[in-house]
Amino acid sequence: MVIANSIKTSIPNYVIKDISLSDFGRKEIKIAETEMPGLMALRDKHHSDKPLNGAKIAGSLHMTIQTAVLIETLVDLGAQVKWASCNIFSTQDHAAAAIAEQGISVYAKKGESLDEYWQYTHYILDWGTDSPNMILDDGGDATGLLILGSKAEKDLSVLKNPSNEEEIALFNSIRSKLQEDSSFYSRIKGNIIGVTEETTTGVARLYQLQKQNALPFPAINVNDSVTKSKFDNLYGCRESLVDSIKRATDVMIAGKVALVMGFGDVGKGSAQSLRGLGAIVKVAEVDPICALQAAMEGFSVVTLNDVVEDIDIFVTATGNYQVITNDNLIKMKDEAIVCNIGHFDNEIDVASLKDYPWENIKPQVDHITLPSGNKIILLAEGRLVNLGCATGHPSFVMSNSFTNQVLAQIELFNKSDEYSKEVYVLPKHLDEMVARLHLDKIGAKLTKLTKDQADYINVSVEGPYKPEQYRY
Protein backbone atom coordinates (compact mmCIF):
# COMPACT_ATOMS: atom_id res chain seq x y z
CA MET A 1 0.00 0.00 0.00
CA VAL A 2 1.19 3.50 -0.83
CA ILE A 3 0.13 6.56 1.16
CA ALA A 4 1.36 9.86 -0.21
CA ASN A 5 1.15 13.22 1.50
CA SER A 6 3.21 16.08 0.15
CA ILE A 7 1.28 18.93 1.73
CA LYS A 8 0.64 19.82 5.37
CA THR A 9 -2.74 18.24 6.01
CA SER A 10 -4.04 15.22 7.87
CA ILE A 11 -5.50 13.89 4.61
CA PRO A 12 -3.01 12.17 2.28
CA ASN A 13 -2.99 13.07 -1.41
CA TYR A 14 -3.73 9.47 -2.25
CA VAL A 15 -3.96 5.99 -0.78
CA ILE A 16 -3.49 3.19 -3.30
CA LYS A 17 -1.99 -0.29 -3.55
CA ASP A 18 1.11 0.39 -5.66
CA ILE A 19 2.11 3.53 -7.60
CA SER A 20 4.42 1.46 -9.81
CA LEU A 21 1.28 0.10 -11.52
CA SER A 22 0.60 3.50 -13.07
CA ASP A 23 2.23 2.75 -16.45
CA PHE A 24 0.10 -0.37 -16.84
CA GLY A 25 -2.97 1.63 -15.88
CA ARG A 26 -2.14 4.39 -18.36
CA LYS A 27 -1.84 1.89 -21.22
CA GLU A 28 -5.28 0.46 -20.44
CA ILE A 29 -6.76 3.94 -20.07
CA LYS A 30 -5.56 4.81 -23.57
CA ILE A 31 -7.30 1.73 -24.95
CA ALA A 32 -10.47 2.53 -23.01
CA GLU A 33 -10.53 6.07 -24.41
CA THR A 34 -10.90 4.64 -27.92
CA GLU A 35 -14.03 2.81 -26.72
CA MET A 36 -15.57 5.79 -24.89
CA PRO A 37 -16.61 8.21 -27.66
CA GLY A 38 -19.15 10.08 -25.55
CA LEU A 39 -16.63 11.19 -22.95
CA MET A 40 -14.02 12.04 -25.55
CA ALA A 41 -16.58 14.13 -27.47
CA LEU A 42 -17.35 16.11 -24.32
CA ARG A 43 -13.64 16.76 -23.84
CA ASP A 44 -13.39 18.08 -27.39
CA LYS A 45 -16.53 20.20 -27.06
CA HIS A 46 -15.77 21.76 -23.67
CA HIS A 47 -11.99 21.80 -23.52
CA SER A 48 -11.87 25.58 -23.94
CA ASP A 49 -14.94 26.81 -22.04
CA LYS A 50 -14.32 24.57 -18.98
CA PRO A 51 -17.95 24.32 -17.74
CA LEU A 52 -16.83 22.65 -14.50
CA ASN A 53 -14.30 25.33 -13.58
CA GLY A 54 -14.84 25.87 -9.86
CA ALA A 55 -16.51 22.52 -9.30
CA LYS A 56 -15.02 20.52 -6.44
CA ILE A 57 -16.32 17.01 -6.86
CA ALA A 58 -16.33 14.29 -4.21
CA GLY A 59 -16.62 11.10 -6.25
CA SER A 60 -17.71 7.75 -4.82
CA LEU A 61 -17.80 5.25 -7.68
CA HIS A 62 -15.96 2.04 -8.61
CA MET A 63 -12.30 2.95 -9.28
CA THR A 64 -11.90 1.16 -12.61
CA ILE A 65 -10.14 1.95 -15.87
CA GLN A 66 -13.41 3.30 -17.26
CA THR A 67 -13.86 5.49 -14.20
CA ALA A 68 -10.35 6.82 -14.74
CA VAL A 69 -11.50 8.12 -18.14
CA LEU A 70 -14.50 9.74 -16.42
CA ILE A 71 -12.29 11.36 -13.77
CA GLU A 72 -9.88 12.76 -16.33
CA THR A 73 -12.81 14.09 -18.35
CA LEU A 74 -14.14 15.95 -15.30
CA VAL A 75 -10.67 17.38 -14.65
CA ASP A 76 -10.25 18.33 -18.31
CA LEU A 77 -13.51 20.27 -18.06
CA GLY A 78 -12.16 22.27 -15.11
CA ALA A 79 -13.18 20.32 -12.01
CA GLN A 80 -11.10 19.49 -8.97
CA VAL A 81 -11.72 15.91 -7.91
CA LYS A 82 -11.24 13.59 -4.95
CA TRP A 83 -12.20 9.97 -5.54
CA ALA A 84 -12.95 6.78 -3.59
CA SER A 85 -14.42 3.49 -4.70
CA CYS A 86 -18.00 2.66 -3.71
CA ASN A 87 -17.20 -1.03 -3.16
CA ILE A 88 -14.37 -2.69 -1.24
CA PHE A 89 -13.62 -5.17 -4.03
CA SER A 90 -14.22 -3.16 -7.22
CA THR A 91 -11.01 -1.12 -7.48
CA GLN A 92 -8.56 -1.89 -10.27
CA ASP A 93 -5.29 -1.01 -8.59
CA HIS A 94 -3.51 -0.04 -11.81
CA ALA A 95 -6.33 2.39 -12.60
CA ALA A 96 -6.02 4.01 -9.17
CA ALA A 97 -2.25 4.25 -9.62
CA ALA A 98 -2.59 5.96 -13.00
CA ILE A 99 -4.95 8.56 -11.52
CA ALA A 100 -2.68 9.17 -8.52
CA GLU A 101 0.28 9.62 -10.88
CA GLN A 102 -1.59 12.53 -12.47
CA GLY A 103 -1.78 14.32 -9.12
CA ILE A 104 -5.48 13.56 -8.61
CA SER A 105 -6.51 12.53 -5.10
CA VAL A 106 -7.71 8.92 -5.08
CA TYR A 107 -8.31 6.62 -2.12
CA ALA A 108 -8.98 3.07 -3.26
CA LYS A 109 -7.49 -0.42 -3.01
CA LYS A 110 -8.96 -3.71 -4.14
CA GLY A 111 -9.83 -5.67 -1.01
CA GLU A 112 -9.80 -2.72 1.37
CA SER A 113 -11.35 -3.29 4.79
CA LEU A 114 -14.69 -1.80 5.81
CA ASP A 115 -12.87 0.55 8.19
CA GLU A 116 -10.67 1.72 5.32
CA TYR A 117 -13.69 2.08 3.06
CA TRP A 118 -15.39 4.56 5.35
CA GLN A 119 -12.11 6.33 6.07
CA TYR A 120 -11.60 6.84 2.34
CA THR A 121 -15.18 8.07 1.92
CA HIS A 122 -14.44 10.64 4.61
CA TYR A 123 -11.26 11.61 2.75
CA ILE A 124 -13.17 12.62 -0.39
CA LEU A 125 -15.40 14.88 1.71
CA ASP A 126 -12.60 16.45 3.75
CA TRP A 127 -10.89 19.25 1.80
CA GLY A 128 -9.25 20.83 4.84
CA THR A 129 -10.21 24.50 5.09
CA ASP A 130 -12.03 24.15 1.76
CA SER A 131 -15.03 21.98 0.90
CA PRO A 132 -16.42 19.95 -1.98
CA ASN A 133 -19.43 21.54 -3.65
CA MET A 134 -20.60 18.58 -5.77
CA ILE A 135 -21.04 14.85 -5.16
CA LEU A 136 -20.88 12.15 -7.81
CA ASP A 137 -22.30 9.08 -6.10
CA ASP A 138 -22.87 5.40 -6.84
CA GLY A 139 -25.12 3.74 -4.30
CA GLY A 140 -25.56 6.83 -2.16
CA ASP A 141 -22.83 6.20 0.40
CA ALA A 142 -21.21 9.65 0.19
CA THR A 143 -24.58 11.38 0.35
CA GLY A 144 -25.78 9.08 3.11
CA LEU A 145 -22.63 9.65 5.14
CA LEU A 146 -23.20 13.41 5.18
CA ILE A 147 -26.83 12.99 6.17
CA LEU A 148 -26.21 10.46 8.93
CA GLY A 149 -23.19 12.38 10.20
CA SER A 150 -25.25 15.58 10.40
CA LYS A 151 -27.87 13.75 12.47
CA ALA A 152 -25.15 12.37 14.75
CA GLU A 153 -23.87 15.91 15.41
CA LYS A 154 -27.18 16.60 17.14
CA ASP A 155 -27.93 13.17 18.55
CA LEU A 156 -25.30 10.46 18.95
CA SER A 157 -27.99 7.89 19.69
CA VAL A 158 -28.50 7.44 15.93
CA LEU A 159 -25.21 5.51 16.06
CA LYS A 160 -26.29 3.36 18.98
CA ASN A 161 -27.45 0.10 17.41
CA PRO A 162 -25.49 -1.07 14.35
CA SER A 163 -27.16 -4.04 12.65
CA ASN A 164 -24.19 -5.48 10.75
CA GLU A 165 -20.42 -5.29 10.26
CA GLU A 166 -20.71 -2.46 7.76
CA GLU A 167 -22.73 -0.29 10.12
CA ILE A 168 -20.23 -0.98 12.91
CA ALA A 169 -17.44 0.39 10.69
CA LEU A 170 -19.59 3.30 9.50
CA PHE A 171 -20.72 4.35 12.97
CA ASN A 172 -17.19 4.11 14.36
CA SER A 173 -15.87 6.29 11.53
CA ILE A 174 -18.49 8.95 12.23
CA ARG A 175 -17.72 8.97 15.97
CA SER A 176 -14.03 9.34 15.19
CA LYS A 177 -14.66 12.26 12.82
CA LEU A 178 -16.92 14.03 15.30
CA GLN A 179 -14.13 13.91 17.87
CA GLU A 180 -11.94 15.82 15.40
CA ASP A 181 -14.61 18.25 14.18
CA SER A 182 -18.03 18.34 15.84
CA SER A 183 -19.66 20.23 12.94
CA PHE A 184 -17.86 18.59 10.00
CA TYR A 185 -20.87 16.96 8.36
CA SER A 186 -23.30 19.87 8.53
CA ARG A 187 -20.60 22.25 7.28
CA ILE A 188 -19.82 20.11 4.23
CA LYS A 189 -23.49 19.33 3.60
CA GLY A 190 -24.26 23.04 3.56
CA ASN A 191 -21.70 23.62 0.80
CA ILE A 192 -22.99 20.93 -1.56
CA ILE A 193 -24.76 22.27 -4.64
CA GLY A 194 -26.08 18.87 -5.66
CA VAL A 195 -25.46 15.18 -6.27
CA THR A 196 -25.62 13.04 -9.39
CA GLU A 197 -26.45 9.40 -8.62
CA GLU A 198 -25.35 6.49 -10.79
CA THR A 199 -27.27 3.42 -9.74
CA THR A 200 -30.72 2.01 -8.99
CA THR A 201 -30.13 1.49 -5.28
CA GLY A 202 -28.76 4.97 -4.72
CA VAL A 203 -31.66 6.49 -6.64
CA ALA A 204 -34.12 4.60 -4.43
CA ARG A 205 -32.44 6.16 -1.39
CA LEU A 206 -32.78 9.63 -2.92
CA TYR A 207 -36.49 9.21 -3.67
CA GLN A 208 -37.04 7.97 -0.13
CA LEU A 209 -35.33 11.10 1.21
CA GLN A 210 -37.44 13.27 -1.10
CA LYS A 211 -40.62 11.59 0.15
CA GLN A 212 -39.55 12.37 3.72
CA ASN A 213 -38.70 16.00 2.80
CA ALA A 214 -35.18 15.17 3.96
CA LEU A 215 -33.20 15.62 0.74
CA PRO A 216 -30.54 18.20 1.67
CA PHE A 217 -29.73 19.34 -1.89
CA PRO A 218 -30.90 18.80 -5.49
CA ALA A 219 -30.17 15.45 -7.10
CA ILE A 220 -30.05 14.20 -10.66
CA ASN A 221 -31.04 10.58 -11.16
CA VAL A 222 -28.55 9.46 -13.81
CA ASN A 223 -29.63 5.83 -13.52
CA ASP A 224 -33.00 6.41 -15.16
CA SER A 225 -31.59 8.08 -18.23
CA VAL A 226 -32.47 5.63 -20.98
CA THR A 227 -28.88 5.58 -22.20
CA LYS A 228 -27.84 4.43 -18.73
CA SER A 229 -30.45 1.97 -17.48
CA LYS A 230 -31.24 0.32 -20.82
CA PHE A 231 -27.57 0.04 -21.77
CA ASP A 232 -25.31 -0.19 -18.70
CA ASN A 233 -27.78 -2.19 -16.61
CA LEU A 234 -28.91 -4.45 -19.45
CA TYR A 235 -26.14 -4.81 -22.03
CA GLY A 236 -23.34 -4.27 -19.52
CA CYS A 237 -24.57 -7.08 -17.26
CA ARG A 238 -25.15 -9.28 -20.31
CA GLU A 239 -21.39 -9.31 -20.87
CA SER A 240 -19.89 -8.86 -17.40
CA LEU A 241 -21.85 -11.44 -15.39
CA VAL A 242 -20.62 -14.58 -17.14
CA ASP A 243 -17.17 -13.01 -17.49
CA SER A 244 -16.93 -12.79 -13.70
CA ILE A 245 -18.35 -16.26 -13.01
CA LYS A 246 -15.95 -17.88 -15.46
CA ARG A 247 -12.91 -15.94 -14.21
CA ALA A 248 -13.75 -16.91 -10.64
CA THR A 249 -14.62 -20.59 -11.13
CA ASP A 250 -13.62 -21.73 -14.65
CA VAL A 251 -16.96 -23.52 -14.66
CA MET A 252 -18.73 -24.56 -17.86
CA ILE A 253 -21.92 -22.51 -18.08
CA ALA A 254 -23.59 -24.65 -20.74
CA GLY A 255 -25.97 -27.20 -19.28
CA LYS A 256 -25.99 -25.65 -15.81
CA VAL A 257 -29.30 -24.71 -14.21
CA ALA A 258 -29.23 -21.04 -13.19
CA LEU A 259 -31.65 -18.97 -11.16
CA VAL A 260 -31.73 -15.20 -11.69
CA MET A 261 -33.56 -13.45 -8.88
CA GLY A 262 -35.03 -10.23 -10.20
CA PHE A 263 -35.95 -9.43 -13.81
CA GLY A 264 -35.42 -5.70 -13.99
CA ASP A 265 -32.85 -4.36 -16.43
CA VAL A 266 -29.95 -5.97 -14.53
CA GLY A 267 -31.81 -9.26 -14.21
CA LYS A 268 -32.77 -9.21 -17.88
CA GLY A 269 -29.15 -8.75 -18.91
CA SER A 270 -28.02 -11.44 -16.48
CA ALA A 271 -30.56 -13.97 -17.73
CA GLN A 272 -29.58 -13.29 -21.35
CA SER A 273 -25.93 -13.62 -20.37
CA LEU A 274 -26.38 -17.08 -18.89
CA ARG A 275 -28.71 -18.32 -21.61
CA GLY A 276 -26.30 -17.09 -24.26
CA LEU A 277 -23.71 -19.58 -23.01
CA GLY A 278 -26.18 -22.45 -22.84
CA ALA A 279 -27.45 -22.38 -19.27
CA ILE A 280 -30.98 -23.48 -18.43
CA VAL A 281 -32.23 -20.25 -16.88
CA LYS A 282 -35.07 -19.79 -14.41
CA VAL A 283 -36.28 -16.48 -13.00
CA ALA A 284 -37.76 -15.52 -9.62
CA GLU A 285 -39.79 -12.29 -9.45
CA VAL A 286 -42.22 -10.44 -7.18
CA ASP A 287 -43.47 -8.02 -9.86
CA PRO A 288 -46.17 -9.57 -12.07
CA ILE A 289 -45.19 -7.43 -15.05
CA CYS A 290 -41.54 -8.45 -14.88
CA ALA A 291 -42.58 -12.05 -14.26
CA LEU A 292 -44.75 -12.00 -17.37
CA GLN A 293 -41.89 -10.47 -19.36
CA ALA A 294 -39.61 -13.29 -18.23
CA ALA A 295 -42.17 -15.91 -19.19
CA MET A 296 -42.69 -14.32 -22.62
CA GLU A 297 -38.91 -14.43 -23.13
CA GLY A 298 -39.03 -18.18 -22.57
CA PHE A 299 -37.72 -18.31 -19.01
CA SER A 300 -39.37 -20.51 -16.38
CA VAL A 301 -40.72 -18.29 -13.61
CA VAL A 302 -40.37 -20.07 -10.28
CA THR A 303 -40.00 -19.47 -6.57
CA LEU A 304 -36.69 -19.93 -4.80
CA ASN A 305 -38.16 -22.37 -2.30
CA ASP A 306 -39.40 -24.67 -5.05
CA VAL A 307 -36.06 -24.98 -6.87
CA VAL A 308 -33.32 -24.18 -4.36
CA GLU A 309 -32.03 -27.76 -4.16
CA ASP A 310 -31.69 -28.08 -7.95
CA ILE A 311 -29.88 -24.88 -8.94
CA ASP A 312 -26.22 -24.82 -9.99
CA ILE A 313 -25.79 -21.02 -10.22
CA PHE A 314 -27.67 -18.45 -8.11
CA VAL A 315 -27.59 -14.77 -9.16
CA THR A 316 -29.35 -12.06 -7.14
CA ALA A 317 -30.27 -8.90 -9.04
CA THR A 318 -33.08 -7.33 -7.03
CA GLY A 319 -31.71 -4.38 -5.07
CA ASN A 320 -33.60 -5.85 -2.12
CA TYR A 321 -32.64 -7.31 1.26
CA GLN A 322 -32.31 -10.95 2.43
CA VAL A 323 -33.35 -12.35 -0.94
CA ILE A 324 -31.41 -15.55 -0.25
CA THR A 325 -31.66 -16.41 3.46
CA ASN A 326 -29.82 -18.92 5.59
CA ASP A 327 -32.77 -21.29 5.27
CA ASN A 328 -32.20 -21.25 1.50
CA LEU A 329 -28.42 -21.46 1.69
CA ILE A 330 -28.31 -24.60 3.81
CA LYS A 331 -30.47 -26.46 1.28
CA MET A 332 -28.20 -25.80 -1.70
CA LYS A 333 -26.59 -28.62 -3.64
CA ASP A 334 -22.90 -29.42 -3.47
CA GLU A 335 -20.70 -26.91 -5.36
CA ALA A 336 -23.57 -24.53 -6.11
CA ILE A 337 -22.25 -21.10 -7.12
CA VAL A 338 -23.79 -18.14 -5.29
CA CYS A 339 -23.30 -14.55 -6.41
CA ASN A 340 -24.88 -11.11 -6.45
CA ILE A 341 -24.96 -8.45 -9.16
CA GLY A 342 -27.12 -5.98 -7.22
CA HIS A 343 -25.36 -2.99 -5.68
CA PHE A 344 -25.20 -3.98 -2.01
CA ASP A 345 -24.03 -7.12 -0.26
CA ASN A 346 -27.20 -7.79 1.74
CA GLU A 347 -29.19 -9.58 -0.97
CA ILE A 348 -27.55 -12.79 0.24
CA ASP A 349 -27.43 -13.51 3.99
CA VAL A 350 -23.65 -13.77 4.03
CA ALA A 351 -23.49 -12.94 7.73
CA SER A 352 -25.22 -16.23 8.59
CA LEU A 353 -22.55 -18.14 6.68
CA LYS A 354 -19.86 -16.89 9.08
CA ASP A 355 -20.92 -19.68 11.45
CA TYR A 356 -19.74 -22.33 8.97
CA PRO A 357 -16.21 -23.35 7.88
CA TRP A 358 -14.74 -21.15 5.12
CA GLU A 359 -11.89 -22.01 2.79
CA ASN A 360 -10.54 -19.21 0.64
CA ILE A 361 -9.72 -20.52 -2.83
CA LYS A 362 -8.41 -17.25 -4.24
CA PRO A 363 -9.29 -13.58 -3.80
CA GLN A 364 -13.09 -13.18 -3.73
CA VAL A 365 -13.75 -16.92 -4.15
CA ASP A 366 -14.67 -18.90 -1.02
CA HIS A 367 -15.69 -22.50 -0.36
CA ILE A 368 -18.18 -22.71 2.51
CA THR A 369 -19.12 -26.03 4.10
CA LEU A 370 -22.80 -26.21 5.04
CA PRO A 371 -24.24 -28.27 7.93
CA SER A 372 -25.35 -30.85 5.34
CA GLY A 373 -21.74 -31.39 4.31
CA ASN A 374 -22.34 -29.79 0.94
CA LYS A 375 -20.04 -26.97 -0.09
CA ILE A 376 -21.10 -23.82 -1.89
CA ILE A 377 -18.89 -21.40 -3.82
CA LEU A 378 -19.53 -17.82 -2.72
CA LEU A 379 -18.23 -15.12 -5.04
CA ALA A 380 -17.05 -11.66 -3.90
CA GLU A 381 -18.51 -12.26 -0.42
CA GLY A 382 -21.94 -11.44 -1.84
CA ARG A 383 -20.87 -8.06 -3.20
CA LEU A 384 -20.96 -7.05 -6.87
CA VAL A 385 -19.61 -10.12 -8.64
CA ASN A 386 -18.81 -8.45 -11.95
CA LEU A 387 -16.50 -5.95 -10.25
CA GLY A 388 -15.25 -8.21 -7.47
CA CYS A 389 -14.31 -11.15 -9.68
CA ALA A 390 -13.78 -9.37 -13.01
CA THR A 391 -13.39 -5.81 -14.30
CA GLY A 392 -17.01 -4.72 -14.62
CA HIS A 393 -18.79 -3.60 -17.75
CA PRO A 394 -17.02 -2.93 -21.07
CA SER A 395 -15.76 0.57 -21.79
CA PHE A 396 -18.23 1.33 -24.57
CA VAL A 397 -21.35 0.82 -22.48
CA MET A 398 -19.81 2.72 -19.57
CA SER A 399 -19.21 5.63 -21.91
CA ASN A 400 -23.00 5.94 -22.18
CA SER A 401 -23.42 6.03 -18.40
CA PHE A 402 -20.50 8.32 -17.71
CA THR A 403 -21.41 10.78 -20.46
CA ASN A 404 -24.71 11.18 -18.63
CA GLN A 405 -22.80 11.73 -15.39
CA VAL A 406 -20.69 14.51 -16.87
CA LEU A 407 -23.74 16.19 -18.41
CA ALA A 408 -25.55 15.96 -15.07
CA GLN A 409 -22.60 17.49 -13.22
CA ILE A 410 -22.43 20.35 -15.74
CA GLU A 411 -26.19 20.90 -15.49
CA LEU A 412 -26.39 21.01 -11.70
CA PHE A 413 -23.20 22.99 -11.19
CA ASN A 414 -24.07 25.70 -13.71
CA LYS A 415 -27.83 25.94 -13.16
CA SER A 416 -28.14 25.35 -9.43
CA ASP A 417 -30.66 28.16 -9.04
CA GLU A 418 -33.06 26.28 -11.34
CA TYR A 419 -33.20 23.21 -9.09
CA SER A 420 -34.91 22.74 -5.73
CA LYS A 421 -34.30 19.95 -3.22
CA GLU A 422 -35.84 17.25 -5.38
CA VAL A 423 -34.75 14.38 -7.62
CA TYR A 424 -34.59 15.13 -11.35
CA VAL A 425 -33.90 13.17 -14.53
CA LEU A 426 -31.90 14.57 -17.45
CA PRO A 427 -34.15 15.83 -20.26
CA LYS A 428 -34.88 13.67 -23.28
CA HIS A 429 -32.80 15.75 -25.71
CA LEU A 430 -29.66 15.06 -23.65
CA ASP A 431 -30.49 11.35 -23.53
CA GLU A 432 -30.74 11.33 -27.31
CA MET A 433 -27.51 13.31 -27.59
CA VAL A 434 -25.67 10.68 -25.55
CA ALA A 435 -26.93 7.95 -27.88
CA ARG A 436 -26.04 10.00 -30.94
CA LEU A 437 -22.45 10.41 -29.74
CA HIS A 438 -21.99 6.63 -29.73
CA LEU A 439 -23.44 5.68 -33.11
CA ASP A 440 -20.44 6.39 -35.34
CA LYS A 441 -18.19 4.13 -33.26
CA ILE A 442 -20.31 1.09 -34.11
CA GLY A 443 -21.01 2.10 -37.70
CA ALA A 444 -24.66 2.99 -37.16
CA LYS A 445 -26.30 5.56 -39.46
CA LEU A 446 -29.45 7.44 -38.57
CA THR A 447 -32.33 7.93 -40.96
CA LYS A 448 -33.49 11.55 -40.96
CA LEU A 449 -37.12 12.61 -40.90
CA THR A 450 -38.42 14.95 -43.55
CA LYS A 451 -40.18 18.08 -42.34
CA ASP A 452 -43.53 16.61 -43.39
CA GLN A 453 -42.83 13.37 -41.52
CA ALA A 454 -41.82 15.26 -38.39
CA ASP A 455 -44.96 17.39 -38.57
CA TYR A 456 -47.09 14.27 -39.08
CA ILE A 457 -45.95 12.75 -35.76
CA ASN A 458 -45.65 16.15 -34.07
CA VAL A 459 -41.93 16.17 -33.31
CA SER A 460 -38.96 18.27 -34.35
CA VAL A 461 -36.80 17.01 -37.20
CA GLU A 462 -33.87 17.01 -34.73
CA GLY A 463 -35.82 15.42 -31.87
CA PRO A 464 -36.66 14.60 -29.16
CA TYR A 465 -38.53 11.80 -30.88
CA LYS A 466 -40.39 10.23 -27.96
CA PRO A 467 -42.53 11.65 -25.13
CA GLU A 468 -41.06 11.68 -21.64
CA GLN A 469 -43.25 8.77 -20.54
CA TYR A 470 -42.19 6.51 -23.43
CA ARG A 471 -40.87 3.12 -22.30
CA TYR A 472 -38.00 1.96 -24.48
From Swiss-Prot:
GO CC list: cytosol
Cofactors named for this entry: NAD(+)
GO molecular function: adenosylhomocysteinase activity
Known pathway: Amino-acid biosynthesis; L-homocysteine biosynthesis; L-homocysteine from S-adenosyl-L-homocysteine: step 1/1
UniProt binding sites for NAD(+): 199-201, 233, 262-267, 285, 320, 341-343, 386
Binding-site residues, substrate: T64, D138, E198, K228, D232
Coiled coil location: none
Catalytic activity of the protein: S-adenosyl-L-homocysteine + H2O = L-homocysteine + adenosine
Cofactor note: Binds 1 NAD(+) per subunit.
Gene Ontology BP, a term: S-adenosylmethionine cycle
Family statement drawn from the similarity comment of this UniProt entry: Belongs to the adenosylhomocysteinase family.
Function: May play a key role in the regulation of the intracellular concentration of adenosylhomocysteine.
Protein's name according to its UniProt entry: Adenosylhomocysteinase
